[in-house]
Regions:
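Membrane-interface transmembrane helices that cradle and orient dolichyl/undecaprenyl
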Residues: 80-83, 123-139, 150, 172-174, ...
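Membrane-interface alpha helices of multi-pass inner-membrane proteins
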Residues: 139-155, 160-165
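Perimembrane helix-loop-helix junctions
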Residues: 160-199
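Membrane-lumen/periplasm interface segments of multi-pass, membrane-embedded glycan/lipid transferases
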Residues: 207, 211-282
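Short acidic/glycine- and proline-prone juxtamembrane loop motifs at membrane-interface regions
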Residues: 102-115
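Short helix- or helix-capping micro-motifs
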Residues: 93-98, 125, 147, 151
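Transmembrane-helix signature of polytopic, membrane-embedded enzymes
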Residues: 26-28, 32-47, 75-99, 117-118
């Protein structure tokens, strides 16, 4: 998509136009670094009016911003499906994302993140619609195409396929527990035809290319190589990095080397905790699962809910 957008522009001198900082690698991922934080040295060639490579970069940044707008619209309409009689909750949900510093940073950069975020939001909106409305072949096929495009934009899109398959399995419970073998069979062929097949058609060629070229269908081994190779970290060493991952959810800029003031992380972490408390209160309080024509507590159906919910947990 990005290549098609900037195809009319002359970017043949991109390597010469972009002046990389030869000492920039010293600041990558190091928030304590006081110098060499910029990976690119900025010159007057970037000044207005933009031309060539720099015009292409700004067009791609604008494209990322438009994808962010699409994501916000998707969040709003998803919330409207959940709370059709309320306008404040959808606006609040949209505002929480719109004012998230990391969201604004990602959607002002040239990256594949804005596209997969947009497609993931579109897929979640479709799943909510399928939960509330009839499960039709057209809707399932559209969901499969959306997930396929997400998987093509980034490997994390594959997780959407697992999530959607588990979600649709639980959706079958909503229609009742009678004749569950037939329901399971229906879920199986619908998932294969309308979800898995479009994903394979859209993203399968890339996975095959990665397998032939790298011996890894996800090409993850190449990212490991670029990061310095497998350092054989233990599980606890990996978990020790979770604080950095948590901060990156809210505000980590530059090349993972620019942090926001401490109060920013406290504020957004507090909002996340309040949200989790609200979810727990809802689950143990007044939550009921609509099964068939009845509204019942899900506790009575734990033996059926647990195996059907396993794909969601995975």
């Amino acid at each position: 998509l990005s290549a098609a957008l900037i195809a009319p522009l002359d970017t043949s001198r991109a390597r010469e136009a972009v002046w990389l900082n030869p000492f920039g690698t010293q600041g990558i991922g190091n928030a304590a670094a006081l110098v060499n934080r910029n990976q690119v040295i900025h010159t007057t060639a970037e000044a207005w009016p933009w031309r060539g490579t720099f015009l292409a970069a700004h067009l791609l940044r604008l494209f990322a911003t438009l994808l962010g707008l699409g994501t916000l619209l998707g969040i709003y309409h998803s919330a409207r499906l959940l709370w059709p009689q309320r306008f404040d909750i959808p606006l609040l949900a949209t505002a929480l994302v719109a004012f998230l510093p990391q969201f604004n940073f990602q959607h002002a950069a040239v990256s594949n993140d804005p596209l997969i975020i947009f497609l993931s939001t579109a897929a979640l909106w479709q799943l909510i619609w399928l939960w509330q409305g009839p499960v039709t072949a057209r809707r399932l096929l559209l969901l499969g195409i959306t997930i396929g495009l997400a998987a093509l934009s980034k490997n994390a899109g594959v997780l959407l396929l697992l999530f959607a398959a588990g979600f649709l399995a639980v959706r079958r419970l909503k229609d009742g527990l009678n004749n569950w073998p037939k329901q399971l069979a229906t879920w199986g062929w619908q998932t294969a035809v309308y979800l898995l097949l479009p994903v394979l058609l859209l993203a399968g060629w890339l996975w095959w290319h990665n397998w032939q070229l790298y011996g890894d269908w996800t090409a993850t081994n190449q990212f490991i190589r670029l990061a310095g190779g497998d350092r054989e970290f233990t599980l606890w060493q990996v978990l020790a990095e979770s604080s950095g991952l948590w901060r990156s959810l809210f505000a980590v800029f530059g090349w993972f080397n620019l942090l926001a003031p401490a109060w920013v992380y406290w504020l957004w972490s507090g909002l996340a905790v309040v949200g989790l408390v609200g979810i727990v209160r809802w689950v143990i309080g007044d939550w009921r699962l609509v099964i068939g024509t009845r509204t019942e507590s899900p506790i009575a159906h734990l033996p059926s809910l647990i195996p059907h919910s396993l794909p969601l947990l995975l």
